[in-house]
Structures are given as C-alpha cells and as structure tokens.
Amino acid sequence: MKVRASVKKICDKCKVIRRHGVVRVICENAKHKQRQG
C-alpha cells in the first residue's frame, strides 16, 4: 500500500474508488495498491 498525495492508475487493471471519503486504487497487482493521505 502506497500512501500518496495524488493517486493515479498505473495499469489498465487499476480502479480508482472512494471508500468512506478515502480515495483508493485497487488492482490485481498488489504493488499498485494506493490510498490518498
């Protein structure tokens, strides 16, 4: 999980979603997981 000021899709499989007001990126590649913080 990377915590970043700006979250971006890294590959085509990445999805940007909002959970409880937190922007997250979920992907089948675990290295691409990010959240905004």
UniProtKB/Swiss-Prot annotation:
Pfam families: Ribosomal_L36
Protein name: Large ribosomal subunit protein bL36
Domain of life: Bacteria
Entry-linked PANTHER family: 50S RIBOSOMAL PROTEIN L36, CHLOROPLASTIC (PTHR42888), LARGE RIBOSOMAL SUBUNIT PROTEIN BL36C (PTHR42888:SF1)
Transmembrane residue ranges: none
Entry GO CC: cytoplasm; ribonucleoprotein complex; ribosome
HAMAP family membership: Ribosomal_bL36
Example GO BP: translation
Disulfide bond sites: none
GO MF assignments: structural constituent of ribosome
PROSITE patterns, per the entry: RIBOSOMAL_L36
Family: Belongs to the bacterial ribosomal protein bL36 family.
Keyword vocabulary terms for this entry: Ribonucleoprotein, Ribosomal protein
